[in-house]
Structure formats: C-alpha cells, structure tokens
Amino acid sequence: MGKGVGRDKYEPAAVSEHGDKKSKKAKKERDMDELKKEVSMDDHKLSLDELHRKYGTDLSRGLTPARAAEILARDGPNALTPPPTTPEWVKFCRQLFGGFSMLLWIGAILCFLAYGIRSATEEEPPNDDLYLGVVLSAVVIITGCFSYYQEAKSSKIMESFKNMVPQQALVIRNGEKMSINAEDVVVGDLVEVKGGDRIPADLRIISANGCKVDNSSLTGESEPQTRSPDFTNENPLETRNIAFFSTNCVEGTARGIVVYTGDRTVMGRIATLASGLEGGQTPIAEEIEHFIHLITGVAVFLGVSFFILSLILEYTWLEAVIFLIGIIVANVPEGLLATVTVCLTLTAKRMARKNCLVKNLEAVETLGSTSTICSDKTGTLTQNRMTVAHMWFDNQIHEADTTENQSGVSFDKTSATWFALSRIAGLCNRAVFQANQENLPILKRAVAGDASESALLKCIEVCCGSVMEMREKYTKIVEIPFNSTNKYQLSIHKNPNASEPKHLLVMKGAPERILDRCSSILLHGKEQPLDEELKDAFQNAYLELGGLGERVLGFCHLLLPDEQFPEGFQFDTDEVNFPVDNLCFVGLISMIDPPRAAVPDAVGKCRSAGIKVIMVTGDHPITAKAIAKGVGIISEGNETVEDIAARLNIPVNQVNPRDAKACVVHGSDLKDMTSEELDDILRYHTEIVFARTSPQQKLIIVEGCQRQGAIVAVTGDGVNDSPALKKADIGVAMGIVGSDVSKQAADMILLDDNFASIVTGVEEGRLIFDNLKKSIAYTLTSNIPEITPFLIFIIANIPLPLGTVTILCIDLGTDMVPAISLAYEQAESDIMKRQPRNPKTDKLVNERLISMAYGQIGMIQALGGFFTYFVILAENGFLPFHLLGIRETWDDRWINDVEDSYGQQWTYEQRKIVEFTCHTAFFVSIVVVQWADLVICKTRRNSVFQQGMKNKILIFGLFEETALAAFLSYCPGMGAALRMYPLKPTWWFCAFPYSLLIFVYDEVRKLIIRRRPGGWVEKETYY
C-alpha cells in the first residue's frame, strides 16, 4: 500500500446534493471492513534501494525542507482525527426523553390536556390533573439529571489517544538533525529515536544499535522486542524492521524512514476502529423498552375499552375523553423510573467495593446475562510477573513455588549442584532491586532489569538469601552481555572460595547453545563427562519444560585454572582470551508468568454458571495452552486435535475436529478462516484458546460469538484491545496496567486487574436482574387498586373511591422505599449454578409477571380497598346499593339535600368530607395490603420462611410506609393541603384479612411450584 493508495482509502466519500445517507452508511461499513482486515504493508520487504526509490528519500541526508512541506500539505498533519463526539446537551436530552421517561412525559401532557378541557368547560375545575402533570414532569427531570450525572464521567476515548501522541521528533532534513513538532513529520522523513522516546510515526528501520521497543500497548506482548533493519517475518506486526507509531523505545538507538503518518498508522487504524464501532443497546435497555411496550399496551387497551363503554353509558364526549386520559395516567407507574435507576446505582456502588468500577449504569446488569467471556491472558489470568517454575539438575526436574504468597511446594536445596546453579543464576545476572524496599516482601519488590532476570533474582533471593552479598563476595571482572547472535551472557568473577581456583566463569543462555559449549556435566556436585545418555536426558527435560509453555534457560560454569589465569590477569572481551567452550553444564531453570491464585476457582464458577471462557492472547500457543490448562479453561481430560493425534500417533489432518472438545487456534490460521469456519469452531468446541492474535482478530472473535447469540464480555488492557472492548456487550478494562484508551472504551474497570473480580460482577449482575423483577412486580401490583376505583366510578356511577392525589402519595410516597429495599434482597439459591438467561425468552417483565401482579394479587388488593370504602360509607348512612347511580347528584355543588339510606340530608361540603375520608381509607388499605405484597415479593420460588427476614432495609421500608400513611392521615392541615382526613383506628383493620389472604395464597402457590417443578402452576405463574 503506497502513499497514494493509503491516502485515497481515507478520502471522504463525495456525497450528492441530496445527502445520500445510504451511501454514507455503506461507506462506513466498507471502511469498518477495511479496518478489520489485517495490517497490509510491504515496506518491510523492500531493500534500502527500493525504499529510496519509493519515498524519494536520501538515506543519509533525508528529505529537503521544501519536499517535506509539499508532502505535509498533501497528507495533512501527523495526528489522529478526533471522532465526532456527542454534544453534552444531546446526552442530557437522551436521559430526559429516552425509554421510560417518554411514557411519563406522555402521561404529563395528557394531564395538562385534561386540565385544559376541564378549565374550558367547568366554572371551578378541580386542580388534580394540573398537580399530577407537574409532579410527573418533576419526576422525569429529577431522575434524568440523576442518570446524566452518573454517566457524565464516561466516553472520552480520543482524549487518551491524544496523550499518547509524542510531542517532539528528531528528523534529519538536508543532512541536518532538527527537532520538530511530531505533527509535522511526513511520509519519507528520516527519523532518529533513542531509548525513552516515543516512536513518532510508523517507521521502517534502516539502521539500529541495540534497539528494543515496548509493543505491549499494541500487540499485548510483554517482553521488549528487538528492532533491526532485517526483514524477519511476512507479518508486518511480527517483523523486526518496523517500529510503530506511539509505542516506546526502551533502549538503544535506531534510524528509520516514515512509511505512514496519522490515521494511516497501525495505531491510527485501531483508533478509528474503536471510535467507529457502534456499541449497540444494552440488554437491560432492551428489557425496559419491552416493558414499556407491555405497560403502554395495557393502558391504551383499558383506556379505549372504557372510553367506548362510557359513550355507551351515555356520558358526554368530553367526560369520556377525560376518563380515557385518567385511566391511561393511572396505569403509568410513576415511581418505577426512579426505582430502577436507584437499584442500578446501588449495585454499581456495591460492585465498586468489590473492585469492579462500572462506568455505565446499565452495564451492571449486562454482566449478569453474560454467556461468553473472552479474556486476555497476561495480567488478567496470570500474575504478570515472570516467576521461576521448574529447575532441572542432578538429572531430575524440581518444581519451584509459583504461588503469590509462597505457600506452595519446595524442593531439596541441599545438593551441591543446586549451590552451583544458584550461584550462576545470581552472578550472571544484571537485574538489581530498586532502592529502599527492604521492608517489602521479596516478591513484591520492584526490580530494574528484564523479566527473566528479575525472576531469577527473586528466586535466588528467596531460596539462598541476599544476592547483593553474593555479588560483593564474587567481584565481577568482565562480562559479555547477551546479544541475539551468540545467544548467551557471560561474566568472570573473583572466586573467594579457597578450595577452588581464583577465577570463576559463569554463563547462561538458550539451552541448546549452552549445551553445545559444554563437554562435562555436574551431577551431585561431581563433574562427569557429557555422554549421549545424559544429552538425551537433557533433551527430554528441555522438551517437557518447553511443552509446559515455560521459557527455559541453560546454565554452565568453568573454574579457570590458576596456572593460565593468575590473579590480576587482564581478560579481554573483544579479542576473547579465555575459554568459552568445554565448559561444565550445571542445569536448566524455566520460568512462566503463573496463573493468579483465585483464577482457577473463578473459571470453575463460570463453568457451573454456564459461561464459556475463551482465552485470547498475543502469546505463543504452547504457553497459552499451558496457562489455559493451569487455570481450567481447558479442563482435565479434554483433548485438542493435536493431543488426539499424538495419542493415536496419526497426522493431525486425519483427526475429526469434532472429536476434540478443546482447541487452540493460531492467529495465522484465523487470518485465513471464513466466518462460517470460525462459527463452527465456536459452536462445536466448548473450550477454546486463541493464540498469537492481533487486535483486529480479537474484534472478529467477539463478533463471531455475538453471531451465535452470545452476550459477550471482553477483558483487555492494551490499546490493541479497545475495538473489541467497544464492540463487546460489556468491555472490561484493567485498572492497574490498563492503558487509558482501553479504560475509555470499556464499560467496566477491574481495579485489581483480577479475573476473579469479573465473576463477582457476574453474580451481582444476576442478582440485580432478579431483584429488579421483584421490585417491578411489587410496584405494578398497586396499579390495580389504583385503577379499579376509577373504572367502577364510571360503570356503576358511584362517588369516586380514590383520588388522583392519593394515587401519587402511593406511587411516589409509600411505595418508593419498599420497592428500592428489594434491591438489597439476598439471592434465593445459588445463582451461579444456573445457565445465563436467554435474552430472547427470559424477559425482565413477562406476561406471567403482569398476570400475577394485575390479575391475581392486584385484584385481592382492590377488593380490600373497596371493602373499606363500603364500610365507611355504610357507617355514615350510605348503604352499598343506595350508592349506585348517585354520582351525578353527589358531585353537583348546587344540590345540598342528598338523602342517604336513612333519610338524612347531606350538603355538598359534608358529602365531600366523607368522600375524601374514603379516599384516605382506600389509600391506607392499599398500604396494608402492600405489606403482604412486599413480603411475598422477597422470593420467586422459595418460601419466605426459608429466605428469612434478614433484609434490614426492607423491614425499615415496612415501617416507613406505615408511618408515612399515618402522617398523611393524621397530620393537622392535611385536609386543606392534600384533602386527606383522619380515620377511625378500626378502619385500618378492614384490609387486614385481605393482606393475610395475599400472603397465604402466594405461599401455597410457591409450595406447588417447588413440589411440582415444570408443572402447570409454574408455567402460568412463575415470573
């Protein structure tokens, strides 16, 4: 992809006058597909001559300033284009008008409409509808502000990319070195980088001196990678002669030619990929939408039916419209929006205490419905520190302790060979502990040096005491540092042991190279000739440790004879004047980044919870497979195709892939797969490891899982993970080692970088889903005793049993705390033993929940309310049958002589006081029956006696709603303010039998469900 091609690919599409949206969308999809493809470039394959011709750059003098200015004008600055951001006011409006809020807004508008109609037609219209409209609007605005505030901290993806862009770059133009702003670097520029610099653009290295770069933010490989002019791999991400934009140079120096700048760099493409991805709706948002459809359906159905009915009953058009509006509004659960928001916030707070920081409230529940987790290996499943795992000396393998707290196995440290091996590992080692860490445990100390050497340093320090003291005793005279051509490191030390010669040569390096330099081997402290049998033993040990996915190093030494090398001898490392062959082989030490202690248990929990854990790593397949087996992602006894082939001794291509439950897929194979082949792998293998994968592939794997209908969680820490984090249903970033970019793209951040915290998150997510169901069931039930009075008022023409203001007191007063208290309810059974919920069938609110809340419990509650209503009116002289058809005269303010059943006459004022007392009593009855409803909503299957009453907030809720009801009824002045009147104590007890009935009815129902699982009762009533 030359300069021209690279540029054209990102030209904005010409859009016709009509603003052709379709072509824009198609272009976006095309661009995304482009980005998903692997990085394609051929600059790493070109010779220096071809590079010179392609870019017109003088390889020693660089570009001329004039040419550089031309290219800058053509390509634009070397910077990442920020994505279009959503303005804050749009985000705020989404909170105000999204989903549930819309339902309440419609309710509010209908209230104002009803008030308007009444004002136009009546002389002194009641203000109920006006109050209701104002309250509904206030509820939406307050909850909207609350949600907006919760989420305002999110989505600044590009901000963090900006911080990663280097500020200055050292370029050579016209043979002169100049430091320029990194944004002015152009394709073809000759750039110099040194240790500590950020790479300013994608470079093709033309000369290097000991240059190493840290690519971890891009590829996920934790080891620094060597950079040299040599073309070593077809894949541009793997070859040594390309350095990538915004990675760090950790040591050495290098010169290179800029091949891509800005958005066209590999990092730029990832940035574009991450910001261009659509996150999609969260499962809970879909659930709430589904719920709104249900509720609206019920409300409109009831409203229209009674509208028609009231016309049949010869009401006027205007009255019928007001009834219609009243019924629809009465159906809206005003308090539910606040309840859901508060429940999610509480869970988010609870998760933060357990090291999961949730950025987006709805993500709390998404984690609970997760059915596949794609996890990174390094640092998430593992401890992210190389640790000595095994040693081979005295012709046997010894296991070292890799646990985080040194509680594991130990080996025999008495052998003389171990003394020699630990001496080499400590001396032939440039790693040192950083200062002032004496009080810290050895394994927690920071080390200056590369990963393998730090592992050796810590191991020897733990097993043999201070390495510094050892190094002081054995003074270093000269050393040859490790380099990639001879693949060993060597040093010569003064030997303080009187029984041995005065100089000790120690060497470590690649095992096969070390063995080639040895003629003898140390066994039990005695030197013996190295024969074929021992060479075979070495080979077997080397293969076994390598097969465990460990990095193996060989160690040897030589005591230099005093005759040839007396004290004060001048050793020369350039013209080597000492032996580097015929040494004595001592042993092997292998290292691995070991699994975290809590991970195997967490993976086991995921498995019993029906969640598939897939490992996706940039690491080597053998290492990946070893760790996967170590943590249980590949469980014991499950074989891969390669294992089966090895067992049956046949070629791999003769094994039927479906016989293997587990599989390890190499990134290079994944590259050539069609999406159907990937789907087959994901469908037919239960245990999967993807190794050597690139960022684009991680995205393809996530999409593959989503095609299977899975809800996918992805963990990641590098920049390379951000596209996958954004695409997944829930992206989980690492809080400690994660790059800013990955944290921005994620929905949740693990503060302790531990995979086990995800499992805690899943548990919390499942619990909140269950508890939201209970909250909603509780809240919806009181809708029926709120609507039925209105319906009976229309049909039977009786005085209104329950007013609008009292309905508001229930929905936004007495019901709020109890509904929220259900969020604190403990899990009924082990929620981690069941399969993830199926988003298509297992809904938050289903028909069964509506039938239970409205059709069964709600009806009993309504009966309780009407019973109280009729009792009070009868005590005042109006018997039930006398009330039928009395509405017209009852509500007429000019009639002051309405007779009751006993012939007494009632004025308008007196009648209204009795009516409002009934409203208050009906309200209190609803509170009383809601006690029972709250208690039965604690569980969906268990008996309340099994669950117990441990939820303190719920008990507080019961007292709170009762106290509030009493306050509203007995507080002086309530008659004028809310038209609530004091009740006789006996009237409180009218609804008690109904409350008891609800409790008994539901306990019996749950008993039948437990006794006959899958039976008719469960099918019809278990929500």
Curated annotation (Swiss-Prot):
Positions where Phosphoserine occurs in the chain: S16, S23, S40, S47, S228, S452, S484, S668, S675, S943
Keywords in alphabetical order: Acetylation, ATP-binding, Cell membrane, Cell projection, Ion transport, Magnesium, Membrane, Metal-binding, Nucleotide-binding, Phosphoprotein, Potassium, Potassium transport, Sodium, Sodium transport, Sodium/potassium transport, Translocase, Transmembrane, Transmembrane helix, Transport
A single Gene Ontology CC term: axon
Extent of Basic and acidic residues compositional bias: 1-11, 28-38
Extracellular domain ranges by topology: 109-131, 309-320, 793-802, 867-918, 971-985
Active site positions, chain numbering: D376 (4-aspartylphosphate intermediate)
Reaction(s) catalysed (UniProt annotation): K(+)(out) + Na(+)(in) + ATP + H2O = K(+)(in) + Na(+)(out) + ADP + phosphate + H(+)
An example molecular function term from Gene Ontology annotations: ADP binding
Tissue-wise expression: Expressed in the central nervous system, in most motor and sensory axons of the ventral and dorsal roots, as well as in the large motor neurons of the ventral horn (at protein level).
Membrane topology note: Multi-pass membrane protein
Modification type Phosphotyrosine: residues: Y10, Y260, Y542
SMART domains in the record: Cation_ATPase_N (SM00831)
Disulfide bridges in this chain: none
Pfam families hit by this protein: Cation_ATPase (PF13246), Cation_ATPase_C (PF00689), Cation_ATPase_N (PF00690), E1-E2_ATPase (PF00122)
Broad class of enzyme this protein falls into: translocase
Known partners and oligomeric status: The sodium/potassium-transporting ATPase is composed of a catalytic alpha subunit, an auxiliary non-catalytic beta subunit and an additional regulatory subunit. Interacts with regulatory subunit FXYD1. Interacts with regulatory subunit FXYD3. Interacts with SLC35G1 and STIM1. Interacts with SIK1. Interacts with CLN3; this interaction regulates the sodium/potassium-transporting ATPase complex localization at the plasma membrane.
Family the entry assigns: Belongs to the cation transport ATPase (P-type) (TC 3.A.3) family. Type IIC subfamily.
PANTHER family, per the entry: SODIUM/POTASSIUM-TRANSPORTING ATPASE SUBUNIT ALPHA, SODIUM_POTASSIUM-TRANSPORTING ATPASE SUBUNIT ALPHA-1
Protein name (database record): Sodium/potassium-transporting ATPase subunit alpha-1
Native source organism of the sequence: Rattus norvegicus
Lineage: Eukaryota, Metazoa, Chordata, Craniata, Vertebrata
